[in-house]
Structures are given as structure tokens and as C-alpha cells.
Amino acid sequence: MVAKETARALRAALDVIEDVGGLGLLATNCGPDHPPNSRVVKAHLLDSKLDTVYIATNRYTDKVQELAKNSLASVSFYTNGASAGDYVVLRGKVTRTIDFGNEKKVISKVWRDEDMLPFFQGGPQDERFCLLEFKPHEVSLISAKHNVAAKDNGWRPAKLERVMEEGAGCSWRLREDDISSDRLRRLRGAYDADGRPLPE
């Protein structure tokens, strides 16, 4: 049962990312005296897995400089339209920066002339072009489409955590957050998880 729920949550997360075309918000840490910095990015998933996310960028941008100082980051995705309200937040670490010289195979899977040539006129060999390799260690999500943590007044997203590397990938498991009944009562107000008034 747990394996089935985990697989459904992973499928839901992948669907949200696919539904928004990979467009998400990357948040990086700017240091102790500054708020986090966020910007819109396009996430690329190879082989339809959440193990590794690639983000194309210019190596001279603020995000690359910030990640060189603190590699922890998050990428958030939110759907609109038919499945409005479904969201995914990936929390993890940028493990390396990839350029054409060290990973031609990965770059060839991500590079699209129509998307990237306006920014990198020299093509994938442009010295400014690089990929950030982001490894999520936690996924938070809500998906009404897949009935994952989707109660109207639930206030508890499903959480997946990365547990073990397995050769070419990793495995994930659903994590149950320890939340007090008092905190849930405050989050939900005078209503149950389905949004119905609680009896007096």
C-alpha cells in the first residue's frame, strides 16, 4: 500500500511539472542579511524521473554566484487551469555545474535551439551556457488530479524524501510529518479536513 501511494505521489509530482512545461521558481540563499532570491527557470527532467533536475542558465548570473556560496535551493511549480491549485516544491542541492566540455551527452538532451539560441547565440558551446544539476532530497506536493493530499482544508501536503541511491537512480518514500492535533486545529479553524464545520 505504501509503495502504491509513493508511486502515485511521484506520478503526481511529475505531472504537475509536465503540466507547466517545466516552468518553475528557483529560490536561492543570498546570505544571512538578505532575503532569498527567486527567479523563473525551466526545469528539465531526463527519463521522466525526479532524481535529477537540470536548469539551463548563464554562468555569470546571480543564481550561479549565489549557489557557489550555498548550494541549497528549492524549485516550486504551480498549476493553473484544469488542475489549478496543484503544486510541487523540490528542496535540494545543486551538486555541480555542467558545460559542453564535460557533459556533451546531457547537454544534447536538454538543448533546444528554439528556446536557447536567443540567449546563447554561440549554441551549446557558448562559453556562457551551463546547466545546473539539481538533486532534490525532499518533495512537497498537493494534487487534486491524483488525489494526493488534496482535501480542501487539509493544510498538509504530501512529503516524499529521497532515501537511497540505486545505480542510475534513487528511491523515494512518503514521509509522515509529526504535527500536533492542536496545530492542525489552528490551521483548519472551526472546520474539518474536508472544509465542513466542526460540531460545537
Q: What spans do the regions from the language model cover?
A:
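Short Pro/Gly-enriched beta-strand edge/turn motifs at strand-loop
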Residues: 20-26, 112-117
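Short solvent-exposed loop/turn micro-motifs enriched in small/polar/acidic residues
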Residues: 19, 36, 124-127
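A generic "binding-loop/recognition-motif" signal
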Residues: 59-60, 137
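Short, structured beta-strand-loop surface elements
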Residues: 62-117, 123-129
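C-terminal edge-of-domain segments
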Residues: 119-200
